[in-house]
Amino acid sequence: MKNKGENILTFKDEDNGDQITMYYDIWLTVIREILMKYANKTYAESLKILNKHYYKKPVGYFECIYLSHELEYHWAMIGAYGEGYWLNDGCSELLPTDYYEWYKKFLDENNFNEPFEFYG
């Protein structure tokens, strides 16, 4: 698979040698598309949301692991609706029924890697 952009980040846990690679541009692109598809945001609104602190580039192994432990859908909904978004009327913590199908199709159509790869 092809990746997008120069923002390929690799971090190593110095204690056990585990490594994680993050395709940061792909991660942001997936979140942007989720915001437009599932939160009904415009392209401009999505770009503005991606400027929030949730999406800052990680600078170390544990920051990267933190971002990888939730699906991109979760990060998109936090950006759109805030922490605890699932407690708001009209928002659910449940994934849309077509999410995994849409996600795989989006990555395939754009020839993208998964946003995270784990080694170790």
How would you name each of these model-derived features?
Residues 1-120:
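C-terminal alpha-helical interaction appendages
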